[in-house]
Amino acid sequence: MTGSIEQGSSQTHGNTHILHFLVRLPRPLETVWPALATADGLCGWFGAVDVLEPRLGGVIGLPGLGAGQVTAWDVERVAEYTVESGGRMRFHLEHDDAGGTALRFTHEFQGEGETESRWRARFEQLIRQAERGA
């Protein structure tokens, strides 16, 4: 099984933008979770992480996006981070029929800071990492 990114969608309501992606990863959910829910894991495909307290209400710090909070946390299922300049990023994992993992991603933010192509590039990196077994 190889990973894939299904067509993303974008909505705009005033100055609020919402991006959605469905990413299929060729690894079991238990091995994908650390890539989304640990500082080391996020560094491997998303970018640097100053701090991440892996729990509801925990602190997260992302260079360039600022400090924030873990606003949803369900181990091996949901990690959601809300940061000062980056808005709300939600990672929702599900088992898929092929033995891999389906990642449903939502990013809600203000302004023009993020783009669909930028997230697609990040998810391509995440897929490569998963395919290597990292």
Tell me what each language-model feature is.
Residues 22-26, 61, 69, 92-94:
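Generic structural detector for well-ordered beta-strands
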Residues 34-47, 75, 121-128, 132:
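Short, intrinsically disordered, mixed-charge
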